[in-house]
C-alpha cells in the first residue's frame, strides 16, 4: 500500500500502489434504488410458518446474513419485495441505541425485510460490498447526526438518498472489497473463539460445581451484602479513574472517587440485568442499583465465591420481582444458598475457572484491537 500525498478530497489517504487518480462522486439516490419492507399481519399465524427469510433490524450485526430468526410463507412474501442474494441491508429504526447505529449486512439468500430495514439495490457502478464498507465507516455518524424522532431515532429514504458517496473503479473496488472481507473474516474467527471459550468455561464450571460437596450456608452467613450509593448522573464523566456500576452489565460512567475496594464481587440489584454477577479487580463506585459482597469470612475464598455465584447467575436472576423496573430484594439475596467445600478445593476450582476467564478477557481485548484496526483502515482507505 502507499500513502497518497495529494490534497484532493477525492483521493483516499491510503491506497493500493497500482491505483491512482481521483474517485468519482455521486449520491446514494442516484446509484441505488432504496427499499424498506413491511411486517406481514401476525393475526394470520400461517404468515410466519414458511421458509422465506424475513430480516429484522436486530439481525444485521455481521458482514453477511444467511438466515433470519423468523421465516414467512410464500403467500405473505407476495406483498413484499424478494431481495436477491448480495443485497446490502441496514437498520433504520431504533438508532438511539448504540448497538443498532451503523449496523448492516449483505444477504446470502433471497430475503424479505421488515419496515425497520432499508435495502440498497445497485443501479450504477458501485458494488454492494463497497457500499457495506462505506457504511461501516460513516454509519455511526449518520445515525447520530441525521436520524430523526423523539423517543425513537429513525432514518428515511429522504435522508439517505441525499448522502454523497465517492467511489473508485470496479477493479479498485473489488480489491478493496477482498481486503476488507479478510479483515471481517479475521474478526469473525476471533468472535467465534471467544464464544467457544465462554461455552467451555460454562461447561467446566457446571461440571465442577455439580460434583462439589461441602457445607450449605446462606450468602448472609459468610458475607455482608452492601447496597451502593446513588450518584447524580450530572456528576458522571465518560472517562475517569473510577468506573460506576449501577444496575447494568457495563459501567454507567466514571467518577472521581470510589466506595468499594478492588477484588470485590458485585451483583446488579435492579433493571433488566438484575442478578448479573461481576468480579471487580479495581476500586469502583457502587451505585444505588448495585450490591457488593463484602467482609467475606476467612475460610471462604473470594474468587471461589465469585465463580460459584456466577455459575448460579440464572438462579439469582430468578429472585427478581416487579415488571417495569425489576429488582432483587436484599433479604432474598441474603438467603441464597452457597456450597462451601474445603479451602483446598475452593482454590483448585477458582484457579481453573479464573484461568479460563482470563484467557477469554485477553482474546476479547484482541478482538477490540482488531475492530479498532479495521476502523482505522476504513477511514484511511475510503472517502
Listing of model-derived features with the role each one plays in the protein:
Residues 1-27, 164-218, 335-383:
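Amphipathic alpha-helical coiled-coil/heptad-repeat segments
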Residues 8, 12, 110-118, 148-171, ...:
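A short glycine-rich beta-alpha junction/loop motif
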Residues 11-39, 62, 162, 207-230, ...:
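Non-catalytic DNA-recognition/assembly elements of restriction-modification systems
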Residues 32-35, 93, 135, 139, ...:
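Hydrophobic aliphatic residues
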Residues 41-49, 147, 233-240, 321:
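Short coil/turn segments at secondary-structure boundaries
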Residues 44-61:
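Short beta-strand/loop turn elements enriched in aromatics
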Amino acid at each position: 500500500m502507499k500513502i497518497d500525498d495529494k490534497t484532493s478530497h477525492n483521493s483516499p489517504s491510503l491506497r493500493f500502489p497500482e491505483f491512482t487518480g481521483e474517485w468519482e462522486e455521486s449520491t446514494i439516490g442516484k446509484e441505488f434504488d432504496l427499499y424498506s419492507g413491511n411486517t406481514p399481519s401476525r393475526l394470520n399465524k400461517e404468515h410466519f410458518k414458511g421458509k422465506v427469510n424475513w430480516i429484522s433490524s436486530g439481525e444485521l450485526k455481521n458482514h453477511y446474513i444467511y438466515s433470519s430468526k423468523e421465516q414467512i410463507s410464500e403467500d405473505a412474501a407476495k406483498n413484499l419485495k424478494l431481495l436477491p442474494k448480495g443485497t446490502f441491508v441496514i437498520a433504520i429504526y431504533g438508532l438511539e441505541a448504540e448497538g443498532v447505529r451503523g449496523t448492516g449486512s449483505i444477504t446470502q439468500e433471497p430475503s424479505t425485510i421488515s419496515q425497520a430495514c432499508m435495502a440498497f439495490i445497485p443501479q450504477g457502478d458501485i458494488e454492494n460490498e463497497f457500499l457495506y464498507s462505506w457504511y461501516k465507516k460513516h454509519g455511526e455518524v449518520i445515525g447520530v447526526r441525521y436520524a430523526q424522532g423523539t423517543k425513537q431515532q429513525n432514518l428515511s429514504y429522504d435522508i439517505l438518498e441525499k448522502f454523497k458517496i465517492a467511489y473508485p473503479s470496479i477493479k479498485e473496488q473489488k480489491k478493496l472489497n477482498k481486503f476488507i472481507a479478510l479483515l471481517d473474516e479475521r474478526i469473525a474467527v476471533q468472535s467465534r473463539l471467544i464464544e467457544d471459550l465462554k461455552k467451555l468455561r460454562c461447561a467446566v464450571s457446571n461440571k465442577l460445581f455439580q460434583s462439589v460437596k461441602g457445607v450449605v450456608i446462606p450468602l448472609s452467613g459468610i458475607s455482608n451484602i452492601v447496597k451502593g450509593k446513588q450518584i447524580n448522573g450530572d456528576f458522571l464523566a465518560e472517562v475517569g479513574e473510577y468506573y460506576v456500576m449501577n444496575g447494568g452489565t457495563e459501567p454507567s460512567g466514571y467518577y472521581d472517587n470510589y466506595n468499594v475496594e478492588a477484588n470485590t464481587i458485585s451483583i446488579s440489584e435492579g433493571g433488566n440485568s438484575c442478578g448479573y454477577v461481576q468480579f471487580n479487580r479495581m476500586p469502583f463506585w457502587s451505585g444505588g442499583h448495585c450490591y457488593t459482597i463484602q467482609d467475606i469470612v476467612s475460610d471462604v475464598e473470594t474468587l471461589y465465591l465469585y465463580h460459584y455465584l456466577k455459575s448460579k447467575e440464572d438462579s439469582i436472576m430468578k429472585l427478581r420481582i416487579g415488571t417495569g423496573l425489576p429488582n432483587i430484594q436484599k433479604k432474598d439475596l441474603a438467603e441464597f444458598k452457597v456450597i462451601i467445600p474445603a479451602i483446598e478445593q475452593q482454590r483448585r476450582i477458582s484457579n481453573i475457572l479464573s484461568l479460563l476467564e482470563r484467557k477469554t478477557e485477553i482474546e476479547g481485548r484482541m478482538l477490540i484491537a482488531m475492530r479498532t484496526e479495521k476502523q482505522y483502515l476504513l477511514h484511511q482507505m475510503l472517502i
